[in-house]
Amino acid sequence: MHPSYQKLLSYVSEIKHLNHSSAAAVVVMQNDQIILEHYEGVHGNEHSNLIGIDSMFNIASARKSYLALAIGYALYEKKIHSLDDCVSKYLKNYDQQIFQGTTIRHLMTHSHGLDERDDGSIYREFAAGESWAYRGINIRIITELFKYLYDYDFTQLLKERVFMPLGFKSTEWSTEESEALVKVIDYPEQKATFQLYPYDDGMGSNLHTTAREFALWGNLHLNMGRHEGIQVVPEDVIRLCTSIQSLQYDDGRLPANGLFWYVQEKAKERSEIGECVPKGSYQILGNTGPLLLVVPENHLVVVRMYNKRYNYGGKNYLHYLREFSNRASDAFTIPSCSKMHRL
């Protein structure tokens, strides 16, 4: 094994240990081929199966990239006129005063300014488009929007139009425990469970996939919707999802987003992408540790999987996310950035 590959895997193992994850996996594709694959650990914090190619991880918020593709279809098929349509044009069941000026673009780029209290009431943190904050309420609204537009769940569209043509066998919204599912650890001393959310939350939660199929999901985007020479997803849908759709912020520290994906424009302090990763790259993350990095400049897809809720580093977790993508950049012959470009 190339020394730089081993160095990256050692780093993945180190963070796995520090964060009390029981499992880790790495799959790297370049030029449509797997060039590195690594599995270690077990499915939970009690006696359980060894991690392997069939192990299905709960990817938590990384499922946003799947919802993003569904909304990309809605735009492509003119179900939505524009990203700049106000949400109130489609959904009437929310307080119109609070939602005033909130567009689909704001919801898809985390610039909507909405949040939710423990009692379920919605309030506004800042005016739509004026800042950026990662909150969960936009996922529920966008999920509702898709169902309003198509009269069925976005998961059905993905299964029929994407998963089946790709031949996916191990990507599913799981509702029952099985030996293939990697359990999520909240606390090392507590029993782990395969689910993060209630079955009926309506947001396509508890999406499980293997490291290989997660990498193929990234590779589909890298190839602009093509898989083994066949155009599975329209190129325009992929372009919508993975190009910058966020507005310019007064605060230069805030990240750029496509449709939920973080997109590398230039190094941003509050972005999860490392400053050494080339422009045009994009990444998605879940709080159980899955990370999918796509680097078009080097025709590269990098997947890292864990099974511990909350990413290592506490309030400084972004540092470790950037550190991983920077190390991946160094390992797979992406030119390193100079000190002048570092944060």
Identify the meaning behind each predicted range.
Residues 141-145, 205-227, 290-306:
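Active-site-proximal alpha-helical segments within enzyme catalytic domains
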Residues 2-57:
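Short, conserved catalytic-motif segment at the N-terminal edge
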Residues 174, 179-183, 191-231, 241:
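Active-site-proximal binding-pocket segments
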Residues 51-54, 123-128, 138-140, 195-203:
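Flexible glycine/proline-enriched surface loops and loop-helix/loop-strand junctions
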Residues 281-343:
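Structured C-terminal helix/loop/strand segments within mature extracytoplasmic catalytic/sensor domains
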Residues 12, 26, 32, 55-83, ...:
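Active-site SXXK
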Residues 182-205, 243-301:
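Active-site Gly/Thr loop motif
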Residues 7, 53, 58-61, 76-115, ...:
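Active-site helix/loop module of the DD-peptidase/beta-lactamase fold
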